[in-house]
Amino acid sequence: MGRPPCCDKIGVKKGPWTPEEDIILVSYIQEHGPGNWRAIPSNTGLLRCSKSCRLRWTNYLRPGIKRGDFTEHEEKMIIHLQALLGNRWAAIASYLPHRTDNDIKNYWNTHLKKKLEKLQSPENGKCQDGNSSVDSDKSVSKGQWERRLQTDIHMAKQALCDALSLDKTSSSTDDPKLSTVQTTQPRPFQASTYSSAENIARLLENWKKKSPVNASSTSQAGSSESTTTSFNYPSVCLSTSSPSEGAISTNFISFNSSNSDILEDHDQAKFEAATNGVNFQDESKPILDNQMPLSLLEKWLLDDSAAVAQGQDVDF
């Protein structure tokens, strides 16, 4: 189970120290100095263990020990170090050389711990009478700031940043000039919408002006294509050598010439309508109506020519 404590040995005295024991210990340390604590009981004849001699010297008998109440600076140091180090009273006492670890521990348990509990609960921190003075308010605010500071430095920095950000937002909201300037500024989106609407109107006007000219150009191109396609068929039909096919081809040429005349009349009427501002879309429908029976006549003529050719072959 480990080494037993030295105080449990037989013949070792426990309890409070007597003045005679204190004088023997102080006189020996003044001669030999504090260091070899294990040799002190055997060299001085004290019925105490080495640990008890060391604690008696460091906590009560050594010179420079400060007695009495703790100052405000010492209280802040104890609160901060206890939050960082915990209940390591010897380590905390090393930062306060004039105080002992035993005194610091006793003062923490009897005073500072209860004081922090009161500050952490805001309801208990308030005065019951309601007539608290300015000094009590300042002490409460100091306690709250110390409570934040004792936990972590980063939290203190964050609290400072929050306070600065609140000051900036309040200053920006308090300025009436800035709010009026922000409200009076026009929105750029409305100007862009107006400009875009004007541009669209101008484009529509230009398109209406250019559309009849484009319609006339497309109609002329369509008429040229129709004439070229209509005159392609006679060249093929004229290449035949039989008289019946020649008659059919002459009929077909006459039909195509009449068709070209009809198309020329139609193109002239369309050009006049375009110059007068008539829409081209209304005139595109009659062209389709006129072209449909022409294709049927062409098929009928071709079928006739094929039947005549087959009859001649049968006669031969």
Swiss-Prot record:
Q: Entry's InterPro entries?
A: Homeodomain-like_sf, Myb_dom, Myb_TF_plants, SANT/Myb
List the GO biological process terms: response to auxin
Q: What is an example of a GO molecular function annotated in this UniProt entry?
A: DNA binding
* A cellular-component GO term for this protein: nucleus
Recite the UniProt keywords alphabetically. Answer: DNA-binding, Nucleus, Repeat, Transcription, Transcription regulation
Sorted alphabetically, which PROSITE patterns does this protein's record hold?
HTH_MYB
KW Transcription (keyword) present: yes
Q: In which tissues is it expressed?
A: Expressed in flowers, leaves and weakly in seed pods.
Localization: Nucleus
Top-level lineage group: Eukaryota
Q: For bias kind Low complexity, which ranges apply?
A: 216-230
| Keyword Amino-acid biosynthesis recorded | no
Annotated DNA-binding residue span(s): 37-61, 89-112
- Extent of Basic and acidic residues compositional bias: 135-144
User: Where do Polar residues bias regions lie?
Assistant: 181-193
Principal location: nucleus
Q: Which Cys pairs are S-S linked?
A: none
Q: Where is this region: Disordered?
A: 119-144, 168-193, 209-230
- Gene3D superfamilies under this entry? Homeodomain-like
Q: Where is the HTH myb-type domain?
A: 9-65, 66-116
Described by its record, this protein's role is as follows: Transcription factor.
| Protein's recorded name | Myb-related protein 306
Name of the coding gene: MYB306
